[in-house]
């Protein structure tokens, strides 16, 4: 069993460097869009993230092509996925819009060049100041999450004498086979009950400055099958059709949210996406087909809004971290008998840098970028630098064990693949370790720093003492 796992992992490593559009190898090193990652890691302090603008563009084109059968589709990048300004700029330059979940996310999108009418505002808590900022800046949509919020929108729009364009977010009551904390359409905190949709729409229609555009939902994140998207879209379509009839209106759009998965495990023949959603299970085309099929049973002229995040940036980044310490330890049973010996490799990135590895037990392919063409044939445990017993990487190739070359030593650079979604956004400064820098590989293959590592001065400048 162990031999077959090792063989499979090394076959995948060969596929990564010889058949993946993102990766290559040179002088034994892993290259990302032609950039030698071992050499790059000597230019900047590790750990840091490396983004690929070409991969962002490819992912956006894949989504757009998937919706080619419905030309009237508008794509809003879920900026909570990664709101580094250089990444937002690449996404803006690629020609799509943005979705935000806080006033500061809205402000960042505006500052990088998105117009107000290219931004959708989501969230379960939008304070009056947030709503006033959104309405004042003429956002494309505010997705209303509660009647309480709606009353604030009404009052603020009257005060400003400005139109507030809104959708009503409803919960379609459709579960999905993803991580429990990523389900947002079944027993979730977001949205109104479907039964409240009519009352909410009637209230909006009586508000002088609030313009009702349609209904909104979001099924979940990293959903590995198309059926929940089809079911939830049908719920939204059926309710939209009914509301148009009973209210005598015509909706401008239907917003189906995001949730297109990214493959974190590539060996599809060995996994079941419904049991392990690290396998993507479906493509952007499958998502689009499920949505369009249901929408077209209602109308073909209505605008479809989508809010992908992970699908845009997930595969577009790697995390580079240096092997900074190593040791061999012995595990004993309670009677003092030797159970096994464990080879530990310590890298300078812990769960403060890559929190999903612990909080969601997320799987990432981990390779020695300095020795990428060498067989990864040694079982090791991989840990971070934090003063915390839980700061080690739990989701290995076999249980908690990872594979690296036997000759892996201190100073080697380790790469975590597919690290572009919900990673930088969730970093902390636990142990007063700095948040990482970010490097961008642009369309020409040139690299530039788009976010520097935190300095000591950054750590203390907010304290008052």
Curated annotation (Swiss-Prot):
Record key words, sorted: Decarboxylase, Lyase, Pyridoxal phosphate
UniProt keyword Chaperone present: no
Sequence positions that bind pyridoxal 5'-phosphate: 259, 307-310, 422
Superkingdom per UniProt: Bacteria
Residues spanning the membrane: none
Catalytic class of the enzyme: lyase
GO molecular function terms noted in the UniProt entry: diaminopimelate decarboxylase activity
pH dependence of function: Optimum pH is 6.5-8.
Pfam families: Orn_Arg_deC_N, Orn_DAP_Arg_deC
GO biological process: lysine biosynthetic process via diaminopimelate
Catalytic activity field: D-ornithine + H(+) = putrescine + CO2; D-lysine + H(+) = cadaverine + CO2
Cystine pairings recorded for this chain: none
EC number of this enzyme: 4.1.1.116
Co-factor requirement: pyridoxal 5'-phosphate
Modified residues (N6-(pyridoxal phosphate)lysine): 80
Residue numbers annotated as active site: 387 (proton donor)
Similarity comment: family membership: Belongs to the Orn/Lys/Arg decarboxylase class-II family.
Quaternary data: Homodimer.
Job of this protein: Catalyzes the decarboxylation of D-ornithine and D-lysine. Ornithine is likely the physiological substrate. Has no detectable diaminopimelate decarboxylase activity in vitro.
The protein, known as: D-ornithine/D-lysine decarboxylase
Organism expressing this protein natively: Salmonella typhimurium (strain LT2 / SGSC1412 / ATCC 700720)
Designated gene of the protein: dokD
């Amino acid at each position: 069993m162990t031999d077959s796992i090792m063989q499979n992992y090394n076959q995948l490593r060969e596929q990564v460097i010889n058949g993946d559009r993102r990766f290559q190898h040179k002088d034994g090193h892993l290259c990302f869009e032609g950039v030698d990652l071992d050499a790059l890691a000597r230019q900047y302090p590790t750990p840091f993230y490396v983004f690929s603008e070409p991969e962002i563009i490819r992912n956006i084109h894949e989504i757009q092509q998937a919706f080619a059968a419905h030309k009237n589709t508008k794509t809003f990048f879920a900026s909570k996925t990664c709101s580094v300004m250089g990444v937002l700029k690449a996404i803006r330059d690629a020609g799509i819009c943005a979705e935000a979940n806080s006033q500061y996310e809205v402000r960042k999108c505006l500052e990088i060049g998105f117009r107000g009418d290219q931004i959708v505002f989501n969230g379960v808590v939008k304070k009056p100041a947030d709503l006033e900022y959104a309405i004042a800046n003429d956002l494309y949509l505010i997705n209303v999450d509660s009647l309480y919020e709606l009353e604030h929108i009404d009052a603020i729009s009257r005060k400003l004498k400005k139109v507030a364009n809104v959708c009503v977010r409803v919960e379609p009551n459709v579960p999905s086979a993803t991580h429990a904390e990523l389900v947002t359409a079944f027993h979730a905190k977001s949205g109104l009950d479907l039964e409240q949709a009519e009352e909410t729409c009637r209230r909006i229609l009586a508000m002088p400055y609030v313009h009702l555009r349609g209904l909104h939902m979001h099924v979940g994140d990293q959903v590995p099958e198309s059926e929940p998207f089809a079911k939830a879209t049908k719920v939204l379509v059926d309710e939209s059709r009914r509301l148009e009839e009973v209210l005598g209106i015509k909706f401008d759009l239907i917003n189906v949210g995001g949730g297109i998965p990214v493959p974190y495990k590539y060996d599809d023949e060995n996994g079941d996406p419904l049991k392990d959603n690290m396998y993507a299970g479906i493509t952007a085309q499958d998502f689009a087909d499920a949505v369009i099929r249901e929408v077209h049973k209602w109308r073909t002229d209505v605008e479809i809004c989508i809010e992908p995040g992970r699908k845009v940036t997930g595969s577009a980044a790697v995390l580079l971290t240096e092997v900074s310490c190593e040791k061999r330890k012995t595990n004993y049973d309670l009677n003092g008998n030797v159970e096994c010996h464990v080879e530990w490799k310590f890298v300078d990135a812990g769960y403060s840098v890559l929190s999903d590895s612990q909080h969601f037990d997320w799987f990432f392919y981990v390779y020695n970028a300095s020795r990428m063409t060498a067989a990864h044939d040694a079982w090791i445990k991989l840990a971070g630098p934090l003063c915390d017993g839980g700061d080690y990487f739990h989701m290995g190739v076999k249980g908690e064990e990872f594979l690296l070359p036997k000759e892996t030593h201190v100073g080697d650079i380790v790469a975590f693949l597919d690290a572009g979604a919900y990673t930088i956004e969730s970093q902390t400064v636990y142990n007063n370790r700095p948040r990482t820098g970010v490097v961008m590989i642009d369309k020409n293959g040139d690299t530039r720093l788009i976010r520097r590592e935190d300095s000591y001065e950054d750590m203390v400048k907010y304290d008052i003492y």
